[in-house]
C-alpha cells in the first residue's frame, strides 16, 4: 500500500470537483478501496498532504458548513458538568441534574454541545480537542478560537472548578493535536501565557451566567480567567413575568450587571425568551422595543430563544392543564421579524431558536431554521434587518471602496462609540469604544475602554497575509484601532485599555500596548 500515492490520486480527483460537492465522499471511498487504505482520511489529512499551491483551492472544495468560521473565528462550545442553579429552577427549564435527563442546568443534554460533553464525561480538555478535530475534519481552520463555556451559572461554581475548567480548555488548544492533559491541572496564568504563542490562539472566552451572579467579585474572577464576553440570561425586562417564571432575579439585577460588565471592558450579550408563561405578544413586542432603545440595556449581541415545552419540565404541566399555550407559528415568525427590524446597527443577532432536537419539543416551534423564516417574512414585506450579522462582509460581499463611520450612543451611564469599517452596506469590521460611567478597576484610571475589535470574513491564519478575496490581515484592524485612539484622546482620556483575548496580546504589543492585569494598555499622546 503506497499511502502517499493514494493521497496524490485523491487530491488530483478532488481538485476537479466544485466546492461542497457530495461526490467528495465517493472519491474518498473509491480511493480507499483502490489502495486498500484502512480508514477514510479526514479532510485535515488530505490538506496536509497537498502541495502549497493546491491547498487554497482544496480547502474551498472540502469546506463543510462554511458559515461556522465566516465571522473570522472558530467557535468552540464546551459544557460544564451538571449542577443546579443557585436560585432553584425556572418554570420552563428543560433539564438539570435532578431531571430525568441528568443534564447541565437549562439544557436537555441532547444539544450537540451537550452530547459532546457527555460523550467525554464533561472533561474540558477532551471536549476542546474533539471540537477542534471536528472543525478540521470539515475543512475549517482553527488558528483562532473563541471558547464558549456553557452549562448553567458558571460564576456560581466553586472558584477552583472554574479555574481548572478554563485552564484545561486552554491546555487542550496549546497541545493540539497530539497532546495529553498534564497529570496535575495547570494554573490559568501559565497556560494563558503559553497560548500567546500557540499555533491555536484563544482570541476570546465567553461565560454564560445569571444577572444576579454577575457582581463585582464575579466579574473580577472572570477577568482573571481571561473572559472577554459574558452572556446574561435576561429572558425578559418585566419583573412580573420574571417572578411568575421563578427566575430569581430582577430587571435591576440585569441593569447592574450590564453596567458593571461594560465598565470592566467586557462585551455583553442577552438571552431573551419571548412567549414565556404570563407574557403576551404585546408585552414581548414591548420587551424588544425596550432592550433596543432603553440605554439601561442595548446589548452588544443577542440570542432569542422562543419558549419551548419539553418533557418533564414544569411548563409541560401548565401546557397539559391549558394554563399555558405557545403562540401560533405565524405569530411567532412575525414577532421575531418585527424584532429584527428594530435592531440597531451596533447589535449582533447571534442566534434564534435553541439546539433542542424536535423530538424533545412537546409544544412550541420545531423549526431549526427560524432565522431564515423571519428573514423571508421581512423580504416578503419589504422590511430589513440592520444587525451586524446580516451585514458582515462574508455574508454580504461588496466591491465598493471602504470608509470609516462612528456611531455614538449612551448606555448604562457611559458613552459608547461604535466605530466601523464599511464597504457600501457591508460591514468589514468594527470596534466598541466606551467612555465608562465609573472606574472600579485600578488598571482603568483615566482610560477609555476598547471592549471589542473584530474584522469579519473567512478566518485567515495567524501570520499569513490575506488573499484578494479575504478581509482579515489587511490593516483594517489597525485603522480601527487608530481611530479609537484618536476618539479617546479627543474625549480627554490619557490612556486606552483594551479587553484583549490572550491570543491577541502579541498583536497589541506590536501596536505599543503593554499588559496591565487582564488588559492591554497604552499611554495616549
Role assignments for model-derived ranges:
Residues 253-255, 259-386, 462-479, 490, ...:
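A structural motif corresponding to the C-terminal lobe/cap of the Radical SAM core domain
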Residues 486-500:
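Conserved GNAT acetyl-CoA-binding A-motif
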Residues 401-402, 408-458:
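A conserved beta-strand-loop-helix scaffold within acyl/acetyltransferase catalytic domains
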Residues 110-127, 147, 151-330, 334, ...:
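Conserved non-cysteine loop/helix-boundary elements of the Radical SAM core domain that shape
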Residues 222, 508, 513:
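Conserved active-site tyrosine of GNAT-family acetyltransferases
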Residues 80-83, 97, 151-153, 209-213, ...:
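Short, flexible loop/turn elements at secondary-structure junctions
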Residues 1-127, 131-182, 345:
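Flexible, acidic/Gly-rich N-terminal and inter-domain linker regions that tether
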Amino acid at each position: 500500500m503506497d499511502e502517499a500515492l493514494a493521497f496524490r490520486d485523491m487530491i488530483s480527483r478532488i481538485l476537479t470537483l466544485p466546492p461542497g460537492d457530495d461526490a467528495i465522499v465517493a472519491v474518498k471511498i473509491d480511493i480507499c478501496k483502490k489502495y486498500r487504505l484502512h480508514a477514510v482520511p479526514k479532510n485535515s489529512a488530505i490538506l496536509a498532504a497537498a502541495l502549497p499551491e493546491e491547498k487554497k483551492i482544496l480547502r474551498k472544495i472540502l469546506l463543510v458548513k462554511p458559515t461556522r468560521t465566516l465571522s473570522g473565528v472558530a467557535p468552540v462550545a464546551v459544557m460544564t458538568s451538571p449542577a443546579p442553579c443557585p436560585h432553584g429552577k425556572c418554570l420552563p427549564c428543560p433539564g438539570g441534574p435532578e431531571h430525568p435527563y441528568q443534564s447541565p442546568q437549562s439544557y436537555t443534554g441532547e444539544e450537540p454541545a451537550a452530547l459532546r460533553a457527555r460523550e467525554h464525561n464533561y472533561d474540558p480538555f477532551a471536549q476542546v480537542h474533539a471540537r477542534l478535530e471536528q472543525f478540521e475534519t470539515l475543512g475549517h481552520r482553527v488558528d483562532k478560537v473563541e471558547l464558549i463555556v456553557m452549562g448553567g451559572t458558571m460564576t456560581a461554581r466553586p472558584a477552583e472548578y472554574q479555574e481548572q475548567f478554563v485552564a484545561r480548555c486552554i491546555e487542550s488548544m496549546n497541545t493540539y493535536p497530539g497532546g495529553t492533559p498534564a497529570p496535575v491541572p495547570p494554573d490559568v496564568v501559565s497556560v494563558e501565557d503559553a497560548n500567546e504563542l500557540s499555533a491555536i490562539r484563544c482570541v476570546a472566552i465567553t461565560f454564560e451566567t445569571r444577572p444576579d451572579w454577575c457582581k463585582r467579585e464575579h466579574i473580577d474572577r472572570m477577568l482573571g480567567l481571561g473572559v472577554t464576553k459574558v452572556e446574561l440570561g435576561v429572558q425578559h425586562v418585566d419583573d412580573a413575568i420574571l417572578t411568575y417564571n421563578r427566575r430569581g432575579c430582577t430587571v435591576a439585577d440585569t441593569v447592574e450587571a450590564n453596567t458593571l460588565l461594560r465598565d470592566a471592558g467586557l462585551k455583553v450579550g442577552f438571552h431573551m425568551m419571548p412567549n414565556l408563561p404570563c407574557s403576551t405578544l404585546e408585552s414581548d413586542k414591548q420587551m424588544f422595543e425596550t432592550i433596543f432603545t432603553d440605554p439601561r440595556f442595548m446589548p452588544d449581541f443577542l440570542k432569542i430563544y422562543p419558549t419551548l415545552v419539553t418533557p418533564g419540565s414544569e411548563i409541560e404541566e401548565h401546557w397539559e392543564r391549558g394554563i399555558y399555550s405557545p403562540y401560533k407559528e405565524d405569530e411567532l415568525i412575525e414577532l421575531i421579524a418585527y424584532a429584527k427590524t428594530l435592531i440597531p446597527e451596533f447589535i449582533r443577532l447571534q442566534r434564534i431558536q435553541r439546539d433542542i432536537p424536535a423530538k424533545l419539543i412537546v409544544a412550541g416551534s420545531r423549526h431549526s431554521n427560524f432565522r431564515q423564516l423571519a428573514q423571508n417574512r421581512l423580504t416578503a414585506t419589504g422590511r430589513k434587518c440592520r444587525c451586524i450579522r446580516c451585514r458582515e462582509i462574508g455574508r454580504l460581499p461588496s466591491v465598493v471602496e471602504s470608509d470609516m463611520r462612528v456611531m455614538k450612543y449612551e448606555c448604562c451611564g457611559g458613552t459608547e462609540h461604535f466605530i466601523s469599517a464599511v464597504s457600501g452596506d457591508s460591514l468589514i469590521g468594527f470596534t466598541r469604544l466606551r467612555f465608562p460611567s465609573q472606574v472600579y478597576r485600578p488598571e482603568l484610571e483615566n482610560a477609555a475602554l476598547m471592549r471589542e475589535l473584530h474584522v469579519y470574513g473567512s478566518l485567515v491564519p495567524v501570520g499569513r497575509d490575506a488573499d484578494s478575496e479575504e478581509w482579515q490581515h489587511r490593516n483594517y484592524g489597525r485603522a480601527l484601532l487608530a481611530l479609537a485612539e484618536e476618539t479617546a484622546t479627543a474625549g480627554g482620556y490619557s490612556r486606552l485599555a483594551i479587553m484583549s483575548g490572550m491570543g491577541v496580546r502579541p498583536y497589541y504589543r506590536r501596536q505599543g500596548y503593554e499588559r496591565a492585569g487582564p488588559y492591554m494598555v497604552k499611554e495616549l499622546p
